Amino acid sequence: EFVVSSDKKLLPYGMMNFADIRLDGYYYVDKTMYIPLIERSNRYFFFIRPRRLAKADAEYAVTLYDVRTKDKFDALFGGLYIGKYPTRDRNSYLVLYLNFSGIIGELHNYRAGLDAHCQTCFDYFCDIYAEYLPQGIKEQLDAKNGAVEQLDYLYHECERAGQDIYLFIDEYDHFINAILSDVESLHRYTKETHKEGYLRAFFNKIKSGTYSSIKRCFITGVSPVTMDVVVSRGIL
């Protein structure tokens, strides 16, 4: 007789939601002992990872720092290293999470894709943190023109409200890698990441935000090429 044991943990194949993995009892390899090292190494952290690897790690970091998950800390992190030795920063930020994997990877229209994605994420941010933010912030934000202006407005309003932002950008290089695969786009790519291109302006605005309410950044992707351009020009 074939019997499936109900005691064995399941492998979280294809799963990236840390809360689901932990609360539903999936197998999880504890790597949270590295969190204190990351916190002490740099407030603005850039992480290059192999493709399709460590996706859930970014997710658990988002969950760890989110002020909204404070009451769930023991359920999510109990038994893990960080649950036994929590850091001072846990559950103390408004988390702004951007994932560039869905942005259209064509240089002639990537700005519209970036604006649309950020608009959705900024609106969601205003909704879930409404109790921490000034009334009417979402309506004022929506009146701004594009991701650069909206980000500028958002981090200034958070500063006025006395709130700190932890900015996560996942797959920051996704649409840029698609652009670089097209030889005809290389010249325009250089234009966008040098001088006053829109992508450069966006990362410049993040840098400006680090003097305001953006207290920490965690940027991850699979290629250093885009970050090499913006870092080498003093953007981050």
Predicted feature residues:
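Phosphate-binding site recognition
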Residues: E1-L236
